[in-house]
């Protein structure tokens, strides 16, 4: 009697596990939503570098 109850319980657990669809595995471990934010960040850093170089460069001396 005890064996049949355990067997039925295991069968129910197995049926529930098979019936619920599993999560699809992502292709990469850390999937990114879109590559655009990284590109925008790179462009912003490049613009910041250009502005820093322009600020460091001394202004040209104009003849009087």
Swiss-Prot record:
Residues 1-19 form the signal peptide. Residues 20-21 form a propeptide. The record marks 23, 25 as: Critical for inhibition of translation, possibly due to its role in mediating the interaction with bacterial 23S rRNA. GO terms for biological process: antibacterial humoral response; defense response to Gram-negative bacterium; defense response to Gram-positive bacterium; defense response to insect; innate immune response; positive regulation of biosynthetic process of antibacterial peptides active against Gram-negative bacteria. One of its GO terms (cellular component) is extracellular region. Residues 32-40 are annotated as: Critical for inhibition of translation, possibly due to its role in mediating interactions with bacterial 23S rRNA and peptide chain release factors. Keywords: Antibiotic, Antimicrobial, Cleavage on pair of basic residues, Glycoprotein, Immunity, Innate immunity, Secreted, Signal. Glycans are attached at residues 28, 32. Unlike many antimicrobial peptides that kill bacteria using a lytic mechanism, proline-rich antimicrobial peptides can enter the bacterial cell to target intracellular processes. 'Buletin' is named after Philippe Bulet, whose dedicated efforts in the 1980s-1990s characterized many of the Drosophila antimicrobial peptides, including Drosocin. Belongs to the drosocin family. This is Drosocin antimicrobial peptides. It comes from Drosophila simulans (Fruit fly).
